[in-house]
């Protein structure tokens, strides 16, 4: 099944909701970066959240970046997504081994530890919007919930989950974001809080084979759910040799000449998808000639 996001409203548009299945996204990231299970879970949660948040943006060229800088062994995470829910990301450290959490789960909170979440929205204006909040738990879903409440003043419930197979491949991944709009009635707020408090974890829903539509129906069915849109989402990197060449030009002729003088090919790595691009000495000479 291909990954996708469902966009919906409920309670006469007092609630807006997103639910996502992201198993292929997270497995693609795991394969690209060869991550250990706790890193797969951390990166997978941020990729899932990023895909849904990307789909919230209006402009075709809008770009969202989620960055976590942290003191834990993972070192940090970076995810970018566009309005079409194309998403990519990487961890600073791909292999982290930690004992399970007290609940017997992958200890993402310990892998991240203390840190800061930055949300950067580039909407083609002079300056991008930047919102920053401290990590609350390092479990990512709670950290995004806190970001929405403090930086965007939108009461939200974010749930993100990644479940692994014994062979360390991704069994299932997904999540939801449910938000109360400013005119939500007190009765709706109380009922929704009660409902969210009753549900099992999002991973157990996904593990049962529940689709994003079924997850939203379970959560919001009694509020009068209206599904608005089904958006495909995937792990996509837009790096090309031409784009990498532009990056090489930007380092300046002096450094470029030093590379040529070394008489060895150079290899440039894309952090997001881990693709390596090799440039021979002849190609480097050609680049410097064309940049004159």
From Swiss-Prot:
The UniProt record lists the keyword Transcription: no
CDD domains xref list: Hsp33 (cd00498)
One GO CC term, this protein: cytoplasm
Main localization of the protein described in the UniProt heading: cytoplasm
Pfam families membership: HSP33 (PF01430)
Localization of this protein: Cytoplasm
MF terms in GO: protein folding chaperone; unfolded protein binding
UniProt entry keywords in alphabetical sequence: Chaperone, Cytoplasm, Disulfide bond, Redox-active center, Zinc
InterPro entries per the UniProt record, alphabetical: Heat_shock_Hsp33 (IPR000397), Heat_shock_Hsp33_C (IPR016154), Heat_shock_Hsp33_N (IPR016153)
Cysteine pairs bridged by disulfides in the record: 237-239, 270-273
Domain of life where this protein originates: Bacteria
Post-translational modification summary for this protein: Under oxidizing conditions two disulfide bonds are formed involving the reactive cysteines. Under reducing conditions zinc is bound to the reactive cysteines and the protein is inactive.
Gene Ontology BP annotations: protein refolding
Family: Belongs to the HSP33 family.
Role noted for this protein: Redox regulated molecular chaperone. Protects both thermally unfolding and oxidatively damaged proteins from irreversible aggregation. Plays an important role in the bacterial defense system toward oxidative stress.
Name of the featured protein: 33 kDa chaperonin
């Amino acid at each position: 099944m291909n990954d996708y996001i469902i966009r919906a409203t409920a309670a006469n548009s007092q609630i807006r909701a997103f639910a996502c299945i992201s198993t292929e996204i997270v497995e693609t990231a795991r394969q690209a970066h060869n991550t250990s299970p706790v890193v797969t879970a951390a990166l997978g949660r941020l990729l899932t959240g990023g895909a849904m948040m990307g789909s919230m943006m209006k402009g075709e060229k809008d770009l969202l970046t989620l960055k976590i800088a942290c003191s834990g062994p993972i070192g940090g995470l970076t995810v970018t997504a566009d309005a079409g829910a194309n998403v990519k990301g990487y961890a600073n450290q791909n292999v982290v081994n930690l004992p399970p959490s007290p609940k017997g789960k992958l200890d993402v909170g310990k892998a991240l530890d203390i840190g800061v979440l930055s949300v950067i929205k580039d909407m083609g204006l002079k300056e991008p919007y930047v919102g920053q909040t401290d990590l609350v738990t390092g479990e990512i879903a709670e950290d995004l919930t806190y970001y929405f409440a403090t930086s965007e003043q939108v009461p939200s419930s974010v749930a993100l989950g990644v479940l692994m197979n014994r062979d360390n491949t991704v069994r299932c991944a997904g999540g939801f974001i449910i938000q109360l709009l400013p005119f939500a009635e007190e009765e709706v707020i109380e009922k929704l809080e009660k409902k969210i408090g009753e549900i099992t974890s999002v991973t157990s829903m996904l593990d049962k084979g529940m689709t994003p539509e079924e997850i939203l129906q379970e959560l919001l069915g009694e509020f009068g759910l209206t599904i608005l849109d089904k958006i495909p989402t995937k792990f996509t990197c837009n790096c090309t040799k031409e784009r990498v060449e532009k990056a090489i030009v930007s380092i300046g002729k002096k450094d470029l000449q030093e590379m040529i003088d070394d008489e060895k090919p150079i290899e440039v790595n894309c952090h997001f998808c881990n693709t390596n691009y090799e440039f021979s000495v002849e190609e480097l000479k050609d680049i410097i000639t064309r940049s004159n």
